[in-house]
Design a protein with these regions (language model features):
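Outer-membrane beta-barrel pore domains
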Residues: 24, 83-84, 128, 141-145, ...
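Short glycine/proline-enriched turns and hinge-like loops at secondary-structure junctions
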Residues: 109-111, 234-238, 273, 309-311
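Short, positively charged
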Residues: 37-39, 186, 345
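General helical secondary-structure elements
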Residues: 34, 39-42, 94-97, 112, ...
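Basic side chains
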Residues: 38, 98-101, 116, 172-175, ...
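Outer membrane beta-barrel
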Residues: 47-228, 237-242, 246-255, 321-322, ...
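Inter-helical turn/loop segments and adjacent helix faces that build the functional surface
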Residues: 230-232
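N-terminal periplasmic/intermembrane-space "pro-region" immediately following the signal or transit peptide
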Residues: 2-81
């Protein structure tokens, strides 16, 4: 009954509206360049003292609940297919809370400062995204195995924006998402319910400092010094460089992003921790007003492994998305992920996956994503001693 009531409220609200201008007790300064979307929580606070107080400080509180059900040819688990990893079960994948004070990227010439804090509390996705040294005892709390649901303070950083440096310099300090690839940790940013192996078995987060400099309207560069990949403050951390170059003409149909993660590349045998090197290339092309194509190629490697010394892997991804209407789109994803030595998934060989799904938004506060997916590895039997896996799944994202 409660879930039905929530969904009915969201359907009634439809898409979030921009806040109506009001005469504040004290006008906040500076004002963001664009008023952010008002989801259910912030809309319910409008006209109240807490709402005014948050607005006066440019602070937004929002989040979403993400739940899924996957019908599978497997009996219990679909690993190494991750995130929606349980077969024929309901999963509450993300209860995501976001508190942020966005920086102002247009208008004032003075620097502005902000922050963001993202937390999964709780959700089953935590077991894939949790960084070492950050509440990671949850991963062994269940007789040496992960709890089904856990908490992950997945991202938190302070931010400063300097509009007069180049065309704008943004600096983040804290625990931040990796800046490469197509897919993302936060569920609403993805076109499909399930994730590609190329996303699952490569880094999710970094801890350190990152700067993004806009050189022109077309070119931007990014550089950061971090403590490694998927690690917070821990004896296994080590200096690592992350950087990227992006080409994206504002009026063009194409964009290119080349990203790297470069450190020692050596497996830390003392602390049993991976320090992979990553090279990633993303190309996007807008075929027409409805049809978009995205390509990603990734190569990763690590050395100093106890057995064999060297391991490498690569992923090739093709996405095709067609917008049938403003509320309905369809996406296909074709992936080849070759875990050459079996270092990433535990089973060597090439994984071929084909996924087709829909994204339906009856209102901007709610999204349904049904999909069908086939996975196959001819060299190993990773799926409960089978070469292949077939799944049909559906999820719902309720934004609040």
């Amino acid at each position: 009954m409660v879930s039905s009531l929530i969904i009915s409220i969201v359907l009634t609200l439809g898409q979030p509206t921009l806040a109506a201008p009001e005469t504040p007790i004290e006008s906040p300064s500076p004002v963001p360049s664009a008023t952010p979307d008002r989801w259910l929580l912030m809309r319910s606070l409008q006209g109240t003292f807490p709402g005014w107080l948050l607005d006066s400080q440019r602070i937004q509180i929002s989040g979403w609940t993400h739940a899924s059900f996957t019908a599978s040819s497997a009996t219990h688990e679909q690993l190494p297919m991750g995130f929606n990893y349980r077969a024929n079960e309901f999963l509450l994948q993300q209860n995501w809370l976001r508190i942020e004070r966005p920086v102002v990227t247009s208008g004032p010439s003075e620097p502005t400062f902000g922050f963001r804090a993202d937390t999964i509390l709780p959700g089953s996705d935590y077991r894939f995204t949790l960084a070492r040294g950050l509440f990671d005892r949850q991963l062994t709390a269940n007789n040496g195995q992960p709890n089904r649901y856990g908490i992950d303070p997945i991202q938190f950083y302070a931010e400063a924006y300097f509009p007069t440096v180049g065309r704008g310099l943004d600096i983040k300090i804290g625990h931040i998402f990796c800046q490469y690839g197509v897919e993302a940790n936060d569920a609403p940013s993805n076109a499909l319910l399930s994730h590609a192996y190329t996303f699952i078995y490569n880094p999710f987060t970094h801890t350190g400092v990152m700067g993004t400099l806009k050189l022109t309207d077309t070119w931007s560069v990014q550089a950061g010094l971090v403590l490694g990949s998927d690690i917070f403050i821990d004896p296994a951390s080590e200096p690592t460089f992350m950087g990227s170059v992006k080409w994206a003409p504002p009026t063009g149909r194409d964009s290119i992003l080349f990203s790297v993660i470069l450190g020692s590349g050596r497996f830390n045998q003392t602390y049993n921790f991976h320090n992979p090197e990553i090279l990633d290339f993303v190309y996007t092309h807008k075929i027409n007003s409805r049809l978009n194509y995205t390509f990603e190629g990734l190569y990763g490697f690590t050395t100093n492994l106890p057995d064999g010394g060297f391991a490498n892997w690569f992923g090739i991804l093709n996405y095709l998305t067609y917008d049938l209407s403003p509320r309905l789109s369809g996406t296909t994803r074709v992936e080849l992920f070759d875990d050459v030595q079996g270092n990433r998934t535990g089973f060597k060989g090439p994984y071929t996956t084909l996924t087709a799904g829909l994204s339906f938004k009856p209102g901007r506060s709610i999204t349904f994503r049904p999909e069908m997916r086939c996975d196959y590895n001819p060299d190993s039997r990773p799926f409960e001693n089978r070469h292949g896996l077939f799944t049909t799944a559906v999820d719902v994202i309720l934004r609040w």
